[in-house]
Amino acid sequence: ALMVIASTSYAQVYKMYKTRNYHNQLRLNTMTGEVQQIQDDGQSWEICSAREILGDKEGRFRLYETQNMWTFIMLDTYTGKNWQVQFSVKGEDYMFAAPINIFSLAYPEKSSNWTNRFQMFATENMWTFILLDSYNGRLWQVQYSTQDLDNLFCIPINKYELVENNERCIFSIQPLTSMYQYYLINDNTGDMWKFQWSTKGDDYRWIERFR
């Protein structure tokens, strides 16, 4: 029992992420959002400076791998802010962190101790992720780009809270046959919604109660 307690109470401040370039890994400070590129010859570079300088919650920041080997998406799981993080072997001019969403989608208090509130899910379109607020069911479509940094965006699919005053993960999503459609599920009540993301415009993004 003591071993179980020790393992469940441990949280990583620094987390290493493998890349598809076997000489390099990314090291994330999960409390502040600082990202460093670590090369196996001993060199290192700061790709992203701390986003929350006074951050004190382990696991607050996460990196998500994309289908582009040089690109990760960093997510602040407390606020929903996210950044496109680029590493490189060509030099520091090719390393950067570009903001995708700079607006807080939730407002944690000092006492907030949220776990995985905001989560991201890759779609079958390599440039598109789904952002979920697992506490209240809000949804956004997140778009990144390696060609045009003016084409980064985070737009709502469902901007309305489906439950109020909840502070734990109760919502999940499930892909359907169409790559554009998913179920949104309240795992507590079984309530379901069907939603669609799209690259064609707002008229093609929708959510409806399923049952």
Regions found by a protein language model. Name each.
Residues 5-11:
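Sec/Tat signal peptide C-region and signal peptidase I cleavage site
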Residues 189-199:
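Short, exposed beta-strand-loop hairpins at the edges of beta-sheets
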Residues 55-74, 106-126, 160-187:
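Short, solvent-exposed interaction modules
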Residues 24-30, 71-77, 127-135, 181-188:
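Short beta-strand motif characteristic of blades in beta-propeller domains
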Residues 41-57, 89-114, 146-167, 198-211:
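Trp- and S/T/G-rich repeat-edge/linker motifs of beta-rich repeat architectures
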Residues 34-35, 81-82, 138-139, 191-192:
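Hydrophobic "anchor" residues
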Residues 38, 73, 85-86, 130, ...:
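Periodic aromatic/glycine/histidine/acidic cluster detector
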Residues 17-42, 46:
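N-terminal targeting signals for Sec/Tat export/insertion, comprising classic cleavable signal peptides
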